[in-house]
Amino acid sequence: MATRQGPLVALATALALAATVVPASAATFVYVGCTDSNEIHVLQLNPQNGNLTPVEKVTIPGIAKTAGSTPMAISPDKKFLFAATRGEPMVAASFRIDAASGKLGHVANGPLDGSMAYIATDRSGRFLLAASYPNHKVTVNPIAPDGTVQPAKQVVPTEPNAHAIQPDASNRFVLATSLGGNLIKQFRFDAATGTLSPNDPPAAQVKAGAGPRHFVFHPSNGRVYLLNELDASVYVLAYDAKTGTLKEEQTLSALPEKKPDKIWAADLHLTPDGKFLYATERGTSTIAGFKVDPANGTLTLIEHTATEQQPRGFAIDPTGRYLLAVGQLSDSLTSYAIDPATGKLIKLKQYPMGKNPNWVEIVNLP
C-alpha cells in the first residue's frame, strides 16, 4: 500500500499547489503540431486538475506534401503562432491567436529558406530565427505587424546540421546548435536590424560524436542546458551574459539503465522556476528528470519515466505543474503532474492526437 499511496499524495499536493498559482482570469491553451495529418490541435488545459479539453483542429493551408516535423513558436506578445512546414512548400504559417478562446486564425504563409528543424522569435517579436538541419544554415526573417513572415533578410551558412536557435534574455546574443559539427554557434544579434554576426569565439565545442540538438536558458542561474542527440548527454554550460559565450561545467547522461539499440535524444525543457529539467529520448521512449542545484546549477538525476512512443516533443505549462509529452509513433499525448517537491512525474491521462505529433507549445492567455 505504501508504494501506491506516495504518488497519490504527491498528485494531490501538486494539484493543490497548481490551483493557487494560476490567476482566475488566465486561461491556458495547448498547441500540438501533427505533421503527417497536417494539423495543429488546440486544447485548453484546466490548471486545477490538468485535464485537457479539445478546442479545435486547424489545417495548415496550401500544403501539398508533409514531411518531418512541425516546429512552432509563439510571439512574445502571445498574439501569433508560427508553424514551419518541411514538405512542399516549405513555409512559415502565421496564425493569429484569439485571446479569449485560444483558437487560431490563419494570417498567411511566408517563405522559408529551407527545411527548418527549429524556429523561434527574437525577444521583440519582430524577427523569426530558424535553423535548417538538411540545409546547414540559420536564417532571419522579418515579421510584419500583422504576423506575416517576410522573406529571409539574412542566411548564414553553418557547420553540418543546424538544429536549434534561440536568443538570450537580453536579445543581444543568439545561440544555435550544429549537430554534425559538434558545436554551439555563438552570435551577436543586432535587434534593431535583425542581423547576426559571429561572436568571439564564434562557437563552443562539445565532445566529438555527441550531436548538439536542443538547449534551454535557465531563467536566473546563468546556465545553459544542452541535450545531445547522438549520445543522450546533457551538458551544463556557464553562460556569460556580458559576452554571450559558453563554458562547459558538467556532463551527465539522460539514458536509462537499459540502453537502446539506437540512441536518439530529442527535446528538453526547464520548469519556469528553474528547479527541474526534463529530457526525452526516442530510442527508449523515456523522459529523464533532473533536479537543478540552486547554488551552482548542476544536475542530479531524479528518475526515468516511460512515456509515449518516440517522444520527439513535449512542453511544460507556465505554472510548472504539468508536463505534456507527445509520441510520433503512438499518435497521442500523455499529461503528467510534476511533484513540486521532488520533480517526479505522475501520469494523469492520455489523449488522441493527429498523425505524427511532434511539437507542443503552451501559453497562458490573455
Label each PLM-derived region with a short phrase.
Residues 37-39, 87-90, 134-137, 181-183, ...:
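Short glycine/acidic-enriched loop and turn motifs that connect beta-strands
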Residues 175-232:
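Loop-centered beta-sheet repeat module
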Residues 32-36, 83-87, 130-133, 168, ...:
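Conserved beta-strand positions in repeat-built beta-propeller and related beta-rich domains
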Residues 26-47:
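An edge-strand/N-cap motif at the start of beta-rich repeat modules
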Residues 53-64, 105-110, 151-156, 199-205, ...:
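A short beta-strand motif characteristic of beta-propeller blades
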Residues 10-20:
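Bacterial N-terminal signal peptides
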Residues 43-50, 95-102, 141-148, 187-196, ...:
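Short loop/turn segments immediately following beta-strands, especially the blade-tip
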Residues 61-77, 112-127, 155-173, 205-223, ...:
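Beta-rich, blade/repeat-based domains predominating
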